[in-house]
Amino acid sequence: IGKGLTIPHHSGIVVHFAVDIGENLILRQNTTIGKIDGDMSDSRIRIGNNVNIGANCCIIGLSRKIGDNATIGAMSFINKDIPSNCTYITKKTGVVLHK
């Protein structure tokens, strides 16, 4: 874990031991960062410097990279690499069923 880690709200955060965290990460509540349980490979999730992760996010996979200066929007699901200097949000669609 790099210096400058900020956790504004300390509830519901899960970070797997195979995660490398750069400097100045902002990590918000109800977020999970991890890989598959039981995976014993050397793969790691790498989070760059100056990354901002919104609330209620899920970042999973065997080997993922979040680049420097990336922003992950609230309620995002990440199962692929995110390049540096970008903002990522998961587009959500809702279905309303009328009775």
Give residue spans per PLM region.
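Conserved switch/coupling elements of ABC/ABC-like ATPase nucleotide-binding domains
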Residues: 92-95
